[in-house]
């Protein structure tokens, strides 16, 4: 069973070719980490995989996916627990995984940068979908937040999920494929 398949994928942004001929297949338990300098196309690759950006060439096939990027995608007026409940029938697993229990009744707009990042990741965790697409998931996280993220990813993979992550920061994903964009 394939959760994500990219075959011969190319991406153009602003008339500039970011990458081409990219092949990647992720099955249950799979992971890939995309690395490269600013502007190399890491975020664009995540957006192509999510179906938010059309590939200039190649094919993209994916299962149901959840995306965490720079957009929080939570109603800032709502308490965190209620905002997460919009995306998941039971947001509790995501809240617990990211250590946000004490903030469940706090309006999203009151969260710090790190807490907002944890909330975005809690949304993905609680989604219950097999494929996680993570764009710079460690940005804004402290050491505890990063450890919680890595533990959540490990649990997701052990349960048969897959992860594609683009990052500048070290992210412990044992056995993950390394994709370097230049």
Task: List where the protein language model places each region.
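Conserved ABC ATPase signature
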Residues: 107-114
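Conserved ABC ATPase "signature" region
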Residues: 91-103, 122
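A short, proline-enriched helix->beta-strand linker immediately N-terminal to the Walker B motif
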Residues: 126-130
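The feature captures the beta-strand-to-loop junction immediately N-terminal to the Walker
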Residues: 35-37
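Conserved structural motif at the start of ABC-family nucleotide-binding domains
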Residues: 4, 18-21, 141
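Hydrophobic anchor residue at the start of the ABC signature
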Residues: 121, 160
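Catalytic Walker B motif of ABC-type/P-loop ATPase nucleotide-binding domains
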Residues: 132-136
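ABC ATPase nucleotide-binding domain signature region
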Residues: 44-90, 168-171
């Amino acid at each position: 069973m394939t959760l994500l398949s990219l075959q011969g994928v190319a991406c153009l942004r602003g008339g500039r070719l970011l990458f081409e001929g990219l092949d990647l297949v992720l099955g249950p338990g799979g992971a890939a980490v995309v690395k490269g300098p600013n502007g190399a196309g890491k975020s664009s690759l995540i957006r192509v995989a999510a179906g938010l950006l059309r590939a200039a060439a190649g094919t993209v096939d994916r299962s149901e996916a959840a995306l965490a990027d720079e957009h929080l995608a939570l109603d800032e007026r709502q308490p965190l627990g209620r905002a997460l409940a919009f995306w998941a029938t039971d947001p509790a697993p995501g809240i617990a995984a990211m250590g946000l229990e004490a903030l469940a009744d706090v309006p999203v707009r009151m969260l710090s940068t790190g807490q907002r990042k944890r909330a975005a990741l809690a949304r993905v965790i609680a989604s219950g979908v097999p494929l996680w697409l993570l764009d710079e998931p460690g940005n804004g996280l402290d050491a505890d937040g990063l450890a919680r993220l890595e533990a959540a990813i490990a649990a997701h993979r052990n349960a048969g999920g897959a992860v594609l992550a683009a990052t500048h920061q070290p992210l412990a994903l044992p056995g993950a494929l390394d994709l370097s964009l230049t």
